[in-house]
Curated annotation (Swiss-Prot):
The keyword Hydrolase appears for this protein: yes
Family: Belongs to the UPF0173 family.
GO molecular function terms attached to this record: hydrolase activity
PANTHER family assigned to the protein according to its UniProt record, in alphabetical order: UPF0173 METAL-DEPENDENT HYDROLASE MJ1163 (PTHR43546:SF3), UPF0173 METAL-DEPENDENT HYDROLASE MJ1163-RELATED (PTHR43546)
Keywords: Hydrolase
InterPro entries with a match to the protein in the record: Metallo-B-lactamas (IPR001279), RibonucZ/Hydroxyglut_hydro (IPR036866), UPF0173 (IPR022877), UPF0173_UPF0282_UlaG_hydrolase (IPR050114)
Protein name: UPF0173 metal-dependent hydrolase VNG_1038C
Source species of the chain: Halobacterium salinarum (strain ATCC 700922 / JCM 11081 / NRC-1) (Halobacterium halobium)
Keyword hit for Hydrolase: yes
Superkingdom of the organism of origin: Archaea
HAMAP family (alphabetical): UPF0173 (MF_00457)
């Protein structure tokens, strides 16, 4: 499994021969990549805020997954034609990837001249094998937390039952959890690798990622914190 961080919460996740793009937003200071330079098989949307769906229209010909509220919105507003609406707890098989939708603790607004509630925001657990309690345990699994605060589902459900190896967690504070809460999330999830995201995009979420690393260490977590540069790709098997 390969991960590319395009800044903010925008990630390409490559599972086998399948490329997924989470939350396309390329107008951020971390990336020099244009949407037209990115070819993927599927787009995953965590919620409808502009800094997560701004460039979904650039992928209008690409199959797009999200909650029914968000997929319906982007179909109407941006011309995305092929969508799958799903809901919390569901898993879809997308090529070589298995994608499970999980809860995020945030708000979700959809803009149509005025902003209205867009339903529940989500995160995704992405794996190269279907989630099961009877498998051989050899799956590689990545958790994209979406925009969220610290929430007990990380400790009670996502960590023990979906068992991610690595997690991308927002650390920018103000709109999401900051370094301290994000570090507790990493500890609860019991991941081997943690990637900070959703920071240094605009002034309210400017943070020092070294604070996140210190907070992770303070929890006693054994997770390695990997602070990626924008447009950097990492092979997760090398990081684990």
């Amino acid at each position: 499994m390969e991960l590319t961080w395009f800044g903010h919460s925008t990630w390409r996740v490559t599972v086998g021969t399948t490329d997924l793009l989470v939350d396309p937003f390329f107008d951020n200071p971390h990336t020099d990549t244009a949407p037209s330079e990115v070819a993927v098989d599927h787009v995953l949307l965590t919620h409808g805020h502009a800094d997560h769906i701004a460039h979904v229209g650039a992928f209008a010909d690409t199959h797009t997954v999200g909650t029914p509220e968000v997929t319906g919105y982007v179909a109407d507003e941006t011309g995305v034609e092929d969508t799958t609406g799903m809901n919390l707890g569901g898993t879809v098989e997308l090529g070589d990837a298995f994608v499970t939708m999980v809860r995020a603790d945030h708000t979700n607004g959809l803009e149509t001249g005025y902003e209205y509630s867009g339903g529940t925001p989500v995160g995704y657990v992405i794996s190269d094998a279907a989630p099961t309690q009877t498998g051989d345990g050899d799956a590689t699994t990545f958790y994209h937390a979406g925009d969220t605060s610290l929430q007990s589902e990380m400790k009670d459900v996502i960590g023990p039952y979906l068992d991610p190896d690595a997690a991308a967690v927002p650390v920018g504070d103000h709109f999401t959890m900051g370094p301290m809460q994000a570090a507790v999330a990493v500890d609860w999830l019991d991941v081997d690798v943690a990637f900070p995201m959703h920071y240094d995009t605009f002034p309210p979420i400017e943070v020092d990622t070294a604070d996140f690393e210190r907070e992770v260490n303070a929890t006693g977590s054994q997770a390695d914190v990997h602070v990626l540069d924008g447009d950097e790709t990492v092979d997760l098997s090398d990081a684990l």
